[in-house]
Amino acid sequence: MAQAWAFLLPVLVFGSYMTSLFFPTYISGPLCGGDGGGRSLFLCAQAPKDQDPSPAVSTMYKTAFHFQPAKNWMNDPSGPMYFNGFYHEFYQYNLNGPIFGDIVWGHSVSTDLVNWIGLEPALVRDTPSDIDGCWTGSVTILPGGKPVIIYTGGDKDQHQAQNIAFPKNRSDPYLREWIKAANNPVLRPDEPGMNSIEFRDPTTGWIGPDGLWRMAVGGELNGYSAALLYKSEDFLNWTKVDHPLYSHNGSNMWECPDFFAVLPGNNAGLDLSAAIPQGAKHALKMSVDSVDKYMIGVYDLQRDAFVPDNVVDDRRLWLRIDYGTFYASKSFFDSNKNRRIIWGWSRETDSPSDDLEKGWAGLHTIPRTIWLADDGKQLLQWPVEEIESLRTNEISHQGIELNKGDLFEIKEVDAFQVVSFSQTCLLGLP
């Protein structure tokens, strides 16, 4: 016997990226049984059958709330940081078109991780050591509040090396201009067993118990994939440690390694160069096989090495940061709110010809807070709280009766904007 249900239906509106087409939202009755407690439900919608299924995405469907430049190609996040009241997001960018090539460091700033100001590129290809591209790297805040970029550059022969740049004027709140070190490149893959075209993506630096800086670089060592470890007194002159931070003989070269401390069950971030609390663990992330994988373990200070809690030889079984289109992620310690934030690159699924037609390609995932689960076995993540500022215009319908098979269309919002809806009461239920 059909039951008539009346319920209050508040709908929260929040823009979200999707490559699909716009379509109306419908709610079909009867609803699943409720407990009167405002249970959250998810909407499922389908595009009309006569809609063109082509993967090409019109400009009107370009993401509105994810981080993305106005046009052209973008890939890896590089060197995110919080400094003097501003969040900085650097990124791999092609000034000349929506396909990979001619890579420089794009640069944008924000006060809230939501609204961004686009600036001129921070680094361009203008020296012999980076003429083939200013590739991925990191930012480290040196003592005295001095940011330094360390990044991979490619020379005319596509050999890779690490380079350094400092802000030209630290009093500029946007840090718009950067000066490359005169002694670039500061690090070359010139030791036995190293591959000069597989040596890139340096991590943020950290200070060890001996007071020396450390940094890891993705590379190959004697055919093994590795996070190569280096030491320095001044962040300018580096010496390779005689063993990697960690290595593995069953995977491809590790791109975009990331290394950071986490405390089980505590979503506060940890600065790797500060005193690490007792009981803390470390995460080693690597980008490999087109996905981002990671291990949880401890940083053995005596051995100066990462030791996984569980050694898994089959890389297919390593933990993953994300099961979607997510690669080349970069995290940073946000001293403003004492948290660790991570970004990833979403390449999307359009073809190069589609990208050329659109005029843009690639975006960064919404920034997420990342921390270690209570059991210390896996990383957890959630969009930063600032994203909720985009949720506006709550829609409320009251006294709507749905009989079995009825449809009620919410016309005020597109399905891709709906965050959730809930009912405060269901009449006719026990």
Which residues does each PLM region occupy?
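Carboxylate/His-rich catalytic cores and anion/metal-binding grooves
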Residues: K146-V186
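Entry beta-strands of beta-propeller and related beta-repeat scaffolds
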Residues: F86-E89, G145-I150, D210-M215, G269-L272, ...
